[in-house]
């Protein structure tokens, strides 16, 4: 009887450990950079480590980038000067620079709950529509 109780206790503790690991599992967001848009799949994730798999699928030979900004502003309402978002006025979490046409790059960031604007900040690209919103929940 004692052995059965211990076995159940060990199994319960092991299950709790597995559950907490699953809660902190790394997530991936596929970010597709087009000529005039950024498509995110999914648009919402849980807080923690998130890997952005960034692909430049633009129909031209332009390099793009992906900048992740924590902000309560709408992704289309960020402060801009001379065709670029003023990143220094916002909380930049990380970025992937210079993704050539037809190429992929990855970056892993730790994201807290909140709203994030995901943008390309090459001159003129944000104004052309290269922005999206990512929502991070607990």
Residue positions per predicted region:
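Short edge-strand/loop segments of extracellular domains
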Residues: 69-75, 136-138
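Beta-strand cores of secreted/periplasmic/IMS beta-sandwich domains, seen most often
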Residues: 41-62, 66-68, 105-118
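Extracellular/periplasmic metallocenter environments
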Residues: 97-138
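Sec/Tat signal peptide C-region and signal peptidase I cleavage site
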Residues: 19-25
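Bacterial N-terminal signal peptides that target proteins for export
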Residues: 1-10
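Extracytoplasmic beta-sandwich strand-turn segments characteristic of Greek-key/jelly-roll folds
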Residues: 73-111
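Cleavable N-terminal signal peptides
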Residues: 11-12, 23
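N-terminal edge beta-strand
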Residues: 26-49
């Amino acid at each position: 009887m004692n052995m059965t109780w211990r076995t159940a206790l060990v199994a319960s503790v092991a299950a709790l450990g597995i559950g907490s690991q699953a809660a902190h599992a790394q997530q991936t967001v596929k970010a597709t950079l087009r000529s005039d848009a950024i498509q995110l799949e999914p648009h919402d994730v849980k807080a923690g480590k998130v890997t952005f798999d960034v692909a430049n699928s633009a129909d031209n030979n332009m390099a793009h980038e992906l900048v992740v900004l924590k902000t309560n502003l709408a992704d289309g309402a960020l402060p801009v000067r001379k065709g670029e978002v003023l990143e220094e006025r916002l909380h930049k979490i990380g970025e992937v620079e210079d993704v050539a046409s037809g190429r992929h790059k990855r970056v892993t960031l730790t994201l807290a709950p909140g709203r994030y604007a995901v943008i390309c900040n090459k001159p003129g690209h944000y104004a052309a529509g290269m922005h999206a919103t990512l929502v991070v929940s607990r």
